[in-house]
Amino acid sequence: RLRNNNPAPLSLIVGLLISEAMDSVSGQKINAGLKWPNDLLINNKKVCGILIESEINGDNNEFIIGIGINYSLPQKESWWGDIGELADILPREKLINSILKKITFYAENGYQNWKSAWEKRCIHMGKEIKAISNNQNDYELGKFKGINEDGKMLLKTRNELKIISSGECSIKGIY
């Protein structure tokens, strides 16, 4: 459980922390890219997803963070990414330990420049995307311009800059 006063960008920050943990454990730049709002990709394939559940407990918001990392997938699911081939430089236990340390540090100290760090690792920054609403029927086409301090998507459509708070994005050629 994690306590924080600004829960909005939590899945983005956790994705950033996981990407940083991969680099630090491996000792090299893994190039795990971030996809709004909660996915990590390597070579344009999803290797990790994040889910956040929240509860209100008195005056506190409490969060449960679920992290799924693909370490060993069957060949028939090859459209997903798998970091099992990186196991010599990303041992599972070391990666988990590093992720937990980074999340704990963030919970206690915050992350000052998380927005610019997230945008640097974003795989669709400045690209044309489809922003899909949670009901999957509505969508907007436009250029991904970044995120605001609350982790909301900034999408430049033909006529305006829209702020999108939930849903997902689809990038041509990725998923």
What is the predicted role of each segment?
Residues 3-4, 12-30, 42-175:
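Long, positively charged amphipathic alpha-helical accessory segments at protein N-termini or as interdomain linkers
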Residues 35-36, 41-42:
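Glycine- and Gly-Pro-enriched alpha-helical subdomains that act as flexible
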